[in-house]
Amino acid sequence: MLSVACSIGDCPITNAYLHILKSKIRNHADSGFFLAGLSASLQLEIQEGSLEHIPHRVVSKGLHLALDWSLQYLEDPRCPVRVAVNWSSAASISAVIRGIISSKSITGLDEETTEAVVIPLIIQAFVSVFGYVVEHPSESVPVQLLFAPGQASIAKSEVWKQTVLLDLPWPCRGRPQGVKRSALSPPICNVRVALFNITIEPLAEFEEAETSSNTRIYHADSTDAFRLKALRQVGDRLDRLGATAVLSQKIVPKYLQTYLATKGIFTLDRLSAAYIRNVQMLSGATILSDWRIDDSIVSSSLGALSLITTQTLGNKQFIRLHREGTVVDSENAHPVTTIAITAPDRFAFDELNHVVTTSVKMLASLIDNPDVVAGAGCVEIHLAALLRDRAKQLRNPGPISNGTVPRGTQTDNKAARTLRQMSQTITTFANCLEDMAGRLCGSHASATDREVMIEQIRHANNESLLATTTLPCQNGLSERKSYDLYGWDPRKRSTMQVLSYTIQSDEEKIASEARILDTLQSKKDALTLVIESVSSLARIASVVRVS
């Protein structure tokens, strides 16, 4: 990809590129395609394009200068492509989700399904846990996704609030043979939950002691008697505490399960760590890590659920755990929402799972940093215009209002050449940014088609582009009272309005319409990671000769 004479196996630069890119994408939220495409384009320019004969240190310096200018532009409150999300506006929230979904064509979602099903599902789920996310910004969002097979369309998907769905069969232990209905048959109501993350095995300590001392005491009869008595004591203590259900991440011995069943206590073991966390949050139970259940364990350590029952979704049965808001007043209990996604197959679910999970995480990130930028290629076109304008000033050095180029620069031949090379580097970066916007035309579009498309976006954004190049001036944005911003609609193959806002007297921007929005932090992170990746490769290329 990056070298004509080398395959991936023997090209050190290509191998380094793939390694760096993989590590960066893992740490990035949702601009993986932007990161991969832009960094690849820049690397091609450095290896065999317009930057091939420019020293790598100058290229790196030029790219970092371009990054600084880009970040300064995006971080300026007067930036014409930037607004803050209005949480009372469904249109703004929908635009952020739409910006994520529109970049994931592999999901195969059509516009009607996106608007009528997917976006409402995500908003409904996020709103249901909004209070928790606000209070616990560093915690993961308690929204669980579940594959409900047997449906050809996502339209049957559902949001289950205050609910955890377990992809497990209903246990039958403890039900007398021939009896169809018992106290442990679903539904089980008003449940008090004991939650364990250990194997309940009284002999474990003795076995560990014997192993560590390299001795083995053969007393099968006495140890068996001790074990069964200890397990019955566990059951008795759980019963006295008022537990009506025992859920465990590890194994609950079959003998104990049967003993608990005689007391009307439901048992479910070998739950995944994710299931245990969700049950703990939903019920408010304290996770128990000692099978003895001594006097320090009180009834308040138990969680509370309204219902444990079965639920059929699609053609599959799940175990459903539900809690009404009034069941328990515990600071440990929190809302948990499950989205049951109907999809024709696991592959389709995985793609939808990624879209929904990313959307929920993005919305959560906007609580602390609500700034977003116009999407669908709009911000790339504006950044390209900004960088070309700055590159011209760099080629003809003079004082720039933000002080990036020092006054009194000695423009001797060497310095002038370096400035020209840096200017060329920044211009190339601008071209690559525009090319990323041009890719919205589709993979089969010609270079001419992309140029025409980019020119159409430029023309539609004429006023905001003018503000972009004059932004360092004090009155760069305040002279206008409103802006309409445009991106590219791949389906209609024409420009579309992605954001419209008015500027209040206090300089606050109020969005009146929003179609496609990207989070500001995500865009800044992607730009930073691109420059870091390409600069790292430039340093490698400066000491590695590829034949």
Q: Language-model segments: which ranges?
A:
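Structural signal for hydrophobic packing residues in well-ordered secondary-structure cores
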Residues: 17, 21-28, 42-54, 63-82, ...
